[in-house]
Amino acid sequence: MGQDGRAELAARIRELRGDKGQAALAAAILHDRTAISRAETGTVLPSRDLVERLDAYYRTGGELGRRRQTLIGGQLPEVSPSDRRDLLAGLAASAGELTVRIRTGRTTPGRSDLLLLQHTVRTVTDTYGVTPHSALIPVVGRHWRLAEGIVADAWKSDRLRPAFRVAAGQLAYLLCRLFFNTGDTAGSATFLELAEEHAVGTGDPALSSAVTGMWSTLHFYAGDYREAATVAVDGRRWGYAYDTAVLAAYEARALGALGDDTGAMRALELMERSPIPSASEPSCEPYSTAWGMLIAGGTLARLGRHEEALPITAGSVTAYDTRSDAPYEMHANALLAHSRALLGADITAAADTVSRALDMVADRPTYSVWARAGELASVMAPHRSVQAVAELRGRLREAPAMLALTAGQTS
């Protein structure tokens, strides 16, 4: 995405606004002022919704939308909410059918099938953080069907069967994550159960550890913090070094949400002592220092230790800001952790930071970001008279259309 093109789009938006104030324009198009401000400075690409509203208001004939589309032309095509809803429903139905068929059948697949599946898992893992979830679902879903079909129709004595089951489990795990971040937690749990069956069937420690971590995440976002912490601790039994820091981080964030200062700090110490993986493994991105700072600062802020948290969360945001390939979900969550730390010092800055996080996922709806943003907006409710807080709360009254797949709450 060219910086020159983004600057030209920003300049054109400023030109159209003319002497009209940003607040007045926001009221006229029923959008929030902070998004308009960032669009005019070129710090982020304006959302499709914003440019469509501006085009309609200024009667440009779609000029801004075309400029924006030119800038994102190299990205994967978007999937409409209705198409994605049908796709998700079909995949979920297939999960139930294929589970019944596993361990039966006759046909034997070729090694080329296995290499294709392994390549897909690796490619999706490597691009997961910078690709909209809606674009990944069809790719992962297609290969998951292939993998599960092979496993379900399989050749019990074939020596490649365990490898196919691991690949099928990795793809089911990826679908679990994708369903979760489109707001479908029930579908996410369905695929996680299937991934867990493959993990148990193969005894693969990497898949087993990853599945455990995702169960902790589902419990955490459901508000069951005690179970989230318990599951994360249980994951250590696999002794899988790649996930040691991640599982400790999941325990820390859950205990922080419970207000358990001693337990949370002990878990953070374990996280910081754990090895940092040098490269990603199939289906799971590696723990990183920036992500560790996000967890540490966010946990301290949950415990009310805002001054201590602030430089840590600021460091995490800076680390992601300076990466051209920063994973957008983690980048946005770093901003949300920083917002939580700012609650003790500057409510306006805290609200604006949440809005920046939402801007980052405006065209890539991500449930983890919207859920945390909703939580922070609720915490800021006593300050609803502050303009930035009022704008944020107004923005969160309606979840993005592409997240409205299930009844997942955002506030």
Protein language model features and the residues they cover:
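Residue-level detector of alpha-helical secondary structure
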Residues: 12, 24, 28, 53, ...
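Helix-turn-helix DNA-binding elements, focusing on the entry/boundary residues of the two helices
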Residues: 22, 33, 51
